[in-house]
């Protein structure tokens, strides 16, 4: 077995990481907001794609750039390290309300200078009524506004930020270079017919792409000039040589395809960076980096030996730390659902590739190097994912387990054995299906060929829908009734449990439809107001169709619906079925009263203990609850499948919705807005995250957990089935322990057809100490949901949720 070196960092990488993790309250940068406001005001007569292209070009020309001491990969998102830009075209309402108090946010604070406060208060009024969020609310019906106000459905994230959740076509970028892409645009423009309406609009889009690609080249040239300027005054010969090498790298990649590993990595980073300057959507991912960068790595490291492996890993480390510099500021309410300010920049390694039509293991030496580099650095970025398949070698799987043992929540695994065949059934071409990658958290798509948001825009609170189903359609939190029904626990008039399930079916169908209606509004406003030009230029077939991604330019386009509280739904239904209808030990009105009182008082607390201990719980491989949950979930899935997204029939293959369970950290704020539930959960406490069991209810170990998760209709949940597991570090102390985990992984993926799994390897005691003494644990990384975050950067509620998760042993 290969033993990875998981302890070595160069001195420069140590210094850069230490500096970054000790930025507790990052600054806010207003340069982008100012530049975009200037260009929007100057070019109100221009079509929106051209206006946005000119704004991005102006910003790339005028913004502050810098090269940090001794860094090897260059490019900055904002004027200061880890500063978060402001994107006023999406929203200004929360900015105006919260900007003066951003430093006081628990776990998500930002430092805002008085000058930046002044700038924002000066420019925000111009944007009022013109932002994406404003225009969404101008289109919502009163019913939709009411639903959003209650929080049963939440869709704030995409009204206040960009789409993203995709990977662009990095292989095409590396093959053609920026000038080659401009040639492709020019060729397509030569075939435009300005007497055809679609071509008239298409010409403006293609013109915008050309403006942006030229601006990207000029921007890279600015860094070449800066590196040379710094080299001229650098006293250390070794650093002077590095600066001149970086300048030469930039000279090449500003126009031409890269010729070395360093150049290829630098070009990919520049594009990754500018995508997140163009739009503030998160989960901009790299797709299968070990595949498209391997030819450069092989040439430099293995064949020419012009680059040694250790220096290649240092280049990767430098890139990973640049990803950590990228930052995003969210509204206070939205930040609670994305605890730790994650960017979800995923890198996928492993899996399979087709050789002469036959699948072959795709693991190569760069796969090991990327895995090892992440294991050494132990950062939150990139979000590292491994594609598992039955033919994966024990050597590589063992290497993955070695990195898991490092305790920073990576790598996560996705399963080729279910993703590939299900993608092919959807209509994805075989070659593309074998080239899928993890995007953001756990969702999957084909890099450079899939539209935005392979995970959804709106979250449904399953627990609140379930409570409404039990009480005649009344939302327990707000008291509002959106879809009235006759049957209610408080009336004691359910005749049998089948009527409870019928009530659930009715309510979830209603809320599912409403969530799609809301998504349609948000989708439409994003399409009309903020087309992403650079991003679309790097996704097939946007240039050929002369359409942005949002207009239907991508080859594929599926979107998943999202929900929170899956385990709470199953556990609650199981408790009602067993204790109320089968055993009759709890009366309908008795349960309703206990829920309304949040189990207050001795009698209600005793009833709560019966709900907790006397009914089966998801996560223990018990069909009586697992299959009931599946039955309830399938109603949601069937309803979701009926709908098409706004790109349907406009070009892409697909255009439908499917389910997904990537709840990020929304289980905490959603739980805070949810009253007591029949599984014994108290009001305002976190819901279960993803498809994981509710905290403290999975008593029979990890094997039972994967048994339960494997019963979910995974083949229909193509947005991903998120499973978090927490293991005590003592569980993986020796080779025999690692073998146990490898067997468990193979069983989960091959026998139970699991979609995804990830591990927290950290003790409860360590987490409690880190919460008590945060300054001593600034570099402690934990898995939150489908992403990792620095534990001390989380809010206290999010920290408590992770501490409360069941700690298993093998």
Would you name each region that the model predicts?
Residues 2-206, 238-245, 249-810:
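Conserved catalytic cores of very large enzyme subunits
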Residues 218, 222-225, 229:
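Extended, non-transmembrane alpha-helical coiled-coils
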Residues 207-218:
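Extended non-globular scaffold/tether segments
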Residues 231-238:
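A conserved hydrophobic secondary-structure block that centers on an alpha-helix together
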